[in-house]
């Protein structure tokens, strides 16, 4: 089974509408829609914005549906000169950019327990997402680190700090927490993001303007991934 998680309705609703033999289960306030797309077993959920919402959703999905793979899909802010609005980022690994125990001597982003800064994605899954994105000719697509934090990135200073600390190519608010949960449960995962803004001082203007278009593109790539998986 393929598990797909998005933070907002706009990031998952079109995929939910594609489900055949659809079943709805509500757990801890989150709706999980399961069924088939292209004869593949799929479960889809809108987790809500932020790392805690995403982690609750991912853990519940794993315990309830036992997916083979988790995909976090949606929009993000670009942290790379190679990614313009509506270009595509696929994660090779993820990092929680707002995790900070540096006063205790840890590196920025260090997660105690798993003792990692960057959580590795399943490279086979990331490569398949990349191949699907490039074959659809939906814009430039690059592989790299995707950073997550409980902040909407809206300043050049925030952007520079994340780039300097982690070399991330895109910033958002859920992927690394989903990756953290997947990693601890030994479930393959990756993150697919389409750029809705440049994570700069104008992102609050660009985001509402380009969010829908970026989300449509991520859904198209997810559908191709499901068909190819």
Name the predicted role of every residue range:
Residues 66-71:
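Proline-aspartate-enriched helix->loop->beta-strand connector
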Residues 79-166:
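Mid-sequence, gly/pro-rich, charge-dense loop/helix-turn segments that line enzyme active sites
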Residues 152-198:
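A C-terminal functional module that forms or caps the active site or interfaces directly
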Residues 18, 124-139, 181, 217-228:
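Generic non-transmembrane alpha-helical segments
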């Amino acid at each position: 089974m393929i598990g797909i998680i998005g933070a907002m309705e706009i990031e998952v609703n079109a995929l939910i509408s594609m489900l055949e033999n659809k079943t709805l289960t509500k757990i801890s306030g989150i709706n999980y829609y399961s069924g088939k797309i292209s004869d593949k077993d799929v479960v889809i959920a809108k987790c809500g914005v932020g790392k805690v919402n995403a982690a609750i959703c991912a853990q519940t999905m794993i315990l309830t549906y036992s997916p083979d793979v988790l995909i976090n899909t949606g929009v993000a802010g670009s942290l790379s000169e190679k990614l313009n609005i509506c270009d595509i980022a696929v994660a090779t690994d993820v990092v929680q950019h707002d995790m900070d125990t540096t006063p205790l001597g840890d590196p920025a982003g260090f997660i105690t327990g798993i003792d990692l800064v960057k959580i590795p994605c399943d490279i086979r899954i990331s490569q398949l997402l990349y191949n699907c994105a490039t074959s659809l000719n939906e814009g430039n697509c690059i592989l790299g680190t995707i950073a997550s934090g409980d902040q909407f990135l809206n300043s050049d200073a925030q952007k520079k700090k994340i780039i300097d600390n982690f070399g991330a190519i895109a910033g958002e608010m859920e992927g690394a927490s989903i990756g953290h949960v997947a990693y601890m449960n030994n479930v393959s995962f990756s993150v697919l993001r389409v750029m809705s803004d440049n994570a700069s001082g104008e992102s609050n203007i660009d985001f509402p303007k380009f969010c829908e278009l970026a989300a449509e593109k991520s859904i198209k790539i997810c559908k191709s991934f499901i068909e190819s998986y």
